[in-house]
């Protein structure tokens, strides 16, 4: 089965892949992965000490909205709505629990469902927000305000015009099954009665299979399973928006140059970074600018691994001053961005 799905793309904090591949092919560097903490897009104010989760989406089987009630009977809408909302919040909780900011134990979603037909309502009034936060004994709420989700199946006839054998005609169909929807989330500050964040997004997940009409269509997911996967990923994506997360990024260090650079490379490969750094520091003052530049570059990585970003920038800049390589300039830019991100992280979570 061939699945073509929407893929969430996160900007990589890594060295340009083409440059890295070129260096690796020459066996002059060794690639490693390090884990970095990426700040959330949304900063929860530090006066917020507790958060509750609220579902304010309208109930589609009660809303009398033709776009909902035309396609499926109320009992089917009830089942799908239950699945979708459960998975929205399960994805959200899993994302938040994967971060260092939240520690949710048996989180509860409080239901404040609406019976109107407004998919995406106006923000809560100060009075209504105060009522909810007081009722839940919380400083803030993360609320699913509304959603619209639909699915569709398209069949494409891709039959082969060639007779493969006498009396045999090859038939092939392409089946595109799509779940598409729009979700609206808001984060409310119950202490000051204001909005912290408002986020509305439209996303699509697609499954594609090929084959004869009966065989291929059975390879597509069941409707409820497709909705489960779609809703879970959308909730997870929103959770990643509001909480810092760990990310694996690619880095490299030089392993060729002179005896000390090679020996330090072996130390680093075996996890003896302190010993490697000692040799690199010796070579950072080498009269050979190429050796000194490599040693300084490696010391920049050593410093970054220890989360010492200012020394890392200093070492990378020193390397670039010696030899103006494009990859070094790129690395300096990455480190500068990480330095700014660290300042943002200090406003989001306590860092030691």
Feature names for model-found ranges:
Residues 69-75, 81, 150-178, 206-209:
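Mixed-charge, low-complexity intrinsically disordered segments
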Residues 33-35, 121-126, 163-167:
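Short linear interaction motifs
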Residues 26-48, 175-182, 186-295, 299-352:
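C-terminal/domain-edge helix-coil "capping" segments
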Residues 139, 151, 271-274:
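Short, compositionally biased leader-like segments
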Residues 40, 128-132, 167-175:
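Catalytic micro-motifs at enzyme active sites that drive phosphoryl/nucleotidyl and oxygen chemistry
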Residues 54-147, 327-330, 339-349:
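N-terminal segment of the mature soluble domain
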């Amino acid at each position: 089965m061939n699945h073509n799905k929407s893929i969430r793309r996160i900007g990589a904090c890594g060295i340009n892949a083409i440059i890295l591949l070129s260096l690796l092919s020459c066996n002059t560097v060794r690639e490693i992965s390090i884990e970095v903490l990426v700040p959330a897009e949304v900063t929860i104010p530090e006066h917020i000490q507790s958060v509750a989760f609220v579902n304010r989406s309208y109930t589609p089987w009660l809303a009398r909205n033709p776009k909902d009630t035309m396609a499926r009977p109320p009992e089917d809408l009830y089942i799908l709505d239950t699945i979708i909302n459960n998975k929205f919040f399960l994805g959200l909780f899993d994302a938040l629990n994967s971060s260092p900011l939240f520690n949710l134990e048996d989180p509860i979603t409080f239901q404040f469902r609406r019976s109107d037909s407004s998919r995406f309502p106006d923000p809560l009034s100060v009075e209504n927000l105060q009522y909810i936060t007081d009722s839940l004994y919380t400083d803030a709420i993360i609320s699913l305000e509304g959603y619209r989700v639909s699915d569709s199946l398209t069949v494409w006839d891709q039959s082969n015009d060639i007779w493969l054998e006498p009396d045999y005609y090859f038939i092939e169909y392409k089946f595109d099954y799509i779940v598409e929807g729009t979700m609206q989330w808001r984060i409310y500050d119950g202490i000051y009665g204001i909005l912290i964040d408002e986020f509305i997004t439209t996303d699509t997940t697609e499954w594609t299979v090929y084959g004869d009409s009966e065989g291929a269509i059975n390879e597509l997911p069941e409707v409820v399973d497709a909705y489960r996967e779609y809703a879970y990923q959308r909730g997870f994506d929103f959770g990643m928006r509001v909480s810092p997360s760990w990310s694996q990024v690619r880095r490299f260090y030089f392993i060729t140059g002179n005896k000390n650079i090679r020996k330090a490379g072996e130390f680093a490969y075996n996890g003896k970074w302190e010993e490697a750094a000692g040799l690199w520091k010796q070579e950072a003052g080498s009269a050979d600018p190429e050796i000194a530049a490599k040693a300084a570059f490696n010391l920049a990585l050593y410093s970054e691994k220890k989360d010492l970003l200012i020394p890392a920038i200093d070492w990378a800049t020193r390397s670039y001053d010696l030899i103006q390589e494009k990859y070094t300039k790129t690395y300096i830019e990455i480190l500068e961005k990480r330095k700014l991100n660290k300042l943002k992280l200090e406003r989001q979570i306590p860092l030691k």
